[in-house]
Curated annotation (Swiss-Prot):
InterPro entries, per database record: DinB-like, DinB/YfiT-like
Protein name as catalogued: Uncharacterized protein YuaE
Residues covered by region (Disordered): 65-93
Compositionally biased region (Basic and acidic residues): 65-76
Cysteine-cysteine disulfides: none
Organism (species): Bacillus subtilis (strain 168)
Membrane-crossing residue ranges in chain numbering: none
Length: 162
């Protein structure tokens, strides 16, 4: 199974049974709630889907080095999300959030499925790695989600102790 799909399955397994209150509870004023992390992941999927639909056809096919995408999982390397990827701060139920994430992921998966084989070697800009092939971009989404899965586990521990 690809890291892209594996990470999402792990996310849903980790969050099973959490109440809406716990999903929306912030460990502190400066930290995101689990729901906010999920909203950020939704925005990543939306941005990736838009990029694949609008920019892949014009992107160059070229060989670039494999990037160490797993470093995206390292939470010691803190990064602030760009403003367009920051979460909304409203209360949303877990079932609504899951529906929204599932719909966006289905749209992203459909965009990926519509690509031709050579499109996976096209190169697109990336804010951290400068440029990635479409194949690397898709893997990056999985590694990025695993980073936030660790964050959600930390948040869960903090709010269960509170």
């Amino acid at each position: 199974m690809s890291i892209f799909n594996e990470a999402r399955l792990e996310t849903w397994n980790e969050l099973k049974g959490l109440s809406d209150e716990k999903l929306n509870q912030k460990p502190s004023a400066e930290e995101w709630s689990i729901r906010e992390v999920l909203d950020h992941l939704k925005k990543i999927d939306m941005t990736a889907q838009k990029m694949l639909k609008e920019r892949v056809k014009d992107a160059p096919i070229k060989e670039i080095e494999e990037k160490p995408l797993e470093v995206a999982q390292d939470r010691n390397n803190k990064r602030k999300a760009p403003s367009h990827l920051e979460p909304a701060h409203d209360f949303i139920s877990g079932s609504q959030m899951k529906r929204e994430l599932d719909v966006v992921r289905e749209q992203l998966t459909a965009a990926i499925a519509s690509l031709k084989e050579e499109d996976f070697e096209r190169v697109l800009p990336h804010p951290v790695f400068q440029e990635l092939t479409v194949r690397q971009w898709i893997d990056f989404i999985g590694h990025h989600e695993k980073r936030h899965l660790s964050q959600m586990k930390e948040i869960k521990e903090k709010i269960e102790r509170a």
